[in-house]
Amino acid sequence: MIQNPILPGFCPDPSIIRVGEDYYIANSSFEWWPGVKIYHSKDLKHYEQLPSPLNRMSQLNMVGEGDSCGVWAPDISWDGEYFWLIYTDVKTRTGGLFNTHNYLVKSKDIRGGWSEPVYLNSSGFDPSVFHDTDGKMYIVNMINNFKGILVQQYDPEKECLVGEAKNVFPGTGRGYTEGPHIYHIGEYYYLLMAEGGTGYEHMVTMARSRSIWGPYEEDPGNPVLTSDVDNPEKLQKCGHADLVCTQNGEWYMVHLCARPPKGSRQCVLGRETAIQKMVWNKEGWLRLVCGGRFGQWETEEPAGIPECLFPEEEGKDYGKEDFDLEIADSAGNNETAKNADIAEILSKTKEYLNEKNAVDEECDKKLSMPVKKTSALLDVRYTSLRQPYDSYTSLTERPGYLRLYGQESLNSCYNVSLVARRQQDRYVQVETCVEFAPTCREQMAGLAYMYDTGNFYLLVKTREEEFGSQTLDLKKPAKLRLIKSDHFDVEDVIPAISIPEEGPVYLRVTTTQEGLYAKIFYSLDGKDYQELAEVPTNILTDEQSDGFTGAHFGMYCHDMTGVRRYADFDYFEIVKTRKEQ
């Protein structure tokens, strides 16, 4: 059996394709950089994360975009030669005014080499590409204000939309019609949609027509998939789906879901990706193979497809990252950056850095802060806010450490120095060790547990000053602060603690009570940890933050003086402390 969710923790809005014996899923990334998460599987059960396709600011510039803006609901497709990726870059979403720009990129290799984007339209979000059996391409998207589903032909040679755009279906009447996908199966064009809103009333509905332009008849059994809201121990928020047919002719639906803790509707893990096996009934409509319409915790594995693990992926979701950059000598022997010559490291990685961490120079010129390209190379699971982290990080200036140069504070939508990982389980322990020498209270560095710019916890080293002081007093002790921001209302959870001016400080967060709370610790030697507080995590959820992402843990540094004072992080560790039920 396949256990759900297949992609845990902040992996919403899945789109799936099969190319031969390989399956690929694309997920929304919102304001998190790089844009769009891609996962690869051979058995629909085990997955490896691939490099993100939108890794240049010429493809995606989110600087200044608000919380839960950025990349919404990408769609991935394949025409036999090219992979196509269509996505929305949402600039604003406040006051019911959605500025939604849709773009298309392509590549012959899903692991890299994605083109510059082609602008399509701004008529709505959740776009998808439909490749018909006659070779024609169509762009499908919902219409802003949920007025229906728009279809228009696309000319791949001219790289533009052609012909008339038509509203082919107004929705089923359940509201919030979005997430459209079209499939040509047999004599029908099937239209798959998300409706009900992306919360607890979320659902998947279908309609069909003998022409792509309609008219479409609604599935009498709608919704095809939804959630048992009266049974909170079941998968919740099931909706926004896509379909794939295996090489053996079996059908599966991937969809987003959520896992609220018992007795709560607060989903700190955000919206995740699940999968259900499907079957076509005699009337030609799609149904869950298990019957009913509620998303299940597990589903049947595809027949005739062997289980395929990715040994190189084992342990990457959890474990300790020491930031030791490995290089190989002429004999093929590896040594870490702590023992290697920096010039040699820079020489051997220069070509790779130029390719993998390219940042559009024109976009750099538009940033308000000076850019220091130091180009850290990290696992694809690490992410940053709105722009590449290579402008403020280094793995080579102090070998064996990740150096972060401080920029703006975490409530900024512009230049924030944060390198983070999404929370994937309710019970985790996250730990890091930082060395930092602040000169004023406007300089902070440490561990962030965050949802967005207005909702977060910070455990940071800083310096204490008298309010309104005109002089710098370095005799004032360094301080450790635990800061809470609840809808931009910022306060200290506990009084600041004096800590040594020099030397490392170890920071730890351990989630408890099914992720509803988190215990905060610190240590000066990495052995004797002192508990500072136990804090609620409700501010880190979709329900409290009015967002669409999920909780992240990250290494963080800010310097609001503009000097870009740096902090050095020795390691970053995530450990699962209890097996999920």
For the regions a protein language model found, what residue spans apply to each?
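Carbohydrate-active catalytic/glycan-binding domains of CAZyme proteins
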Residues: 1-581
